[in-house]
């Protein structure tokens, strides 16, 4: 776990307004907030904000991978899982036998959005002379990243807490191959004799 550091350096990043007590004031303020003191002013080093966005993108990416797998398991021809019913919003307009994996799609879309935000956040590292206007973009990206991450977590919670796992269908799918999907150990044993 990497905590976000606090920030207290003043407008120019020098603590000039705090005089000779600047570091002491910063240390006490961070202790009171329960945050570590930053190594450098955020005016010159943008990595802390970028790291937060990258962390959120990683979190959403993990949830997006799970959602992608779940959406495939809900396919009619696989049928090993079903999303919680969405009151008709998940029904296909053209295929009455099909339920669309709306929750999985929402999680995957949130993960894609956060990946795009991560790329933009990385661009914000290259601010010219500390004040090039990129900071405005960074503020927007960080705020949007938290909003999208919250949605991703909320929808994932709904998806996973209501997920129907169809063990009987999993068993049927495994039996289709008549054991061939479990034949790796046989292959390894035979390889020793070739």
Regions found by a protein language model. Give the residues of each.
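Internal glycine-rich alpha/beta core junctions
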Residues: 1-124
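Glycine-rich cofactor/substrate-binding loops
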Residues: 93-194
